[in-house]
């Protein structure tokens, strides 16, 4: 930088980026934050992330429970329909058997 002006490189090449200090001691006092304050911010951020994870997990559990409830309801409905069909078929067999018996009895009476 020439004459302390920012944004212009000594070489005059505008595509060169401005170099910054790697460690915190090179920063200005106004930019430095104490270690405790940084750790407090990091702790708060970690708490927020943990809470978000917990909320997501709870939401996923609720969604899974709802899906399972729907699945069991559909399964119960299918079982009910299947049993009704089976009962109707068995009832028809009983009716047919009674008719055959009545025919036999009628034929025996006519003799």
Curated annotation (Swiss-Prot):
Keyword flag rRNA processing:
yes
Function text: Involved in nucleolar integrity and required for processing of the pre-rRNA for the 60S ribosome subunit.
Localisation: Nucleus, Nucleolus
InterPro entries, sorted: Cgr1-like
**Domain of life assignment:** Eukaryota
Query: Cystine bridges: which residues?
Result: none
Q: Where is this region: Disordered?
A: 21-80
Q: Which family does it belong to?
A: Belongs to the CGR1 family.
According to its UniProt entry, this protein's organism is Schizosaccharomyces pombe (strain 972 / ATCC 24843) (Fission yeast)
**Compositional bias per record (Basic and acidic residues), positions renumbered to this chain:** 34-80
Taxonomic lineage = Eukaryota, Fungi, Dikarya, Ascomycota, Taphrinomycotina
Q: Which Pfam families match?
A: Cgr1 (PF03879)
Protein's name according to its UniProt entry: rRNA-processing protein cgr1
Keyword annotations: Coiled coil, Nucleus, Ribosome biogenesis, rRNA processing
User: What are the annotated GO cellular component locations?
Assistant: nucleolus; nucleus
């Amino acid at each position: 930088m020439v004459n302390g002006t920012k944004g212009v490189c000594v070489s005059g090449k505008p595509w060169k980026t401005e170099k910054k200090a790697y460690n915190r001691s090179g920063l200005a006092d106004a930019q430095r934050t104490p270690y405790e304050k940084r750790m407090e911010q990091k702790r708060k951020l970690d708490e927020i992330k943990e809470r978000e994870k917990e909320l997501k997990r709870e939401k996923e559990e609720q969604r899974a429970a709802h899906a399972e409830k729907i699945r069991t309801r559909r399964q119960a409905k299918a079982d009910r329909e299947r049993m009704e069909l089976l009962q109707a078929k068995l009832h028809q067999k009983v009716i047919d058997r009674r008719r055959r018996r009545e025919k036999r009895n009628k034929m025996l009476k006519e003799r």
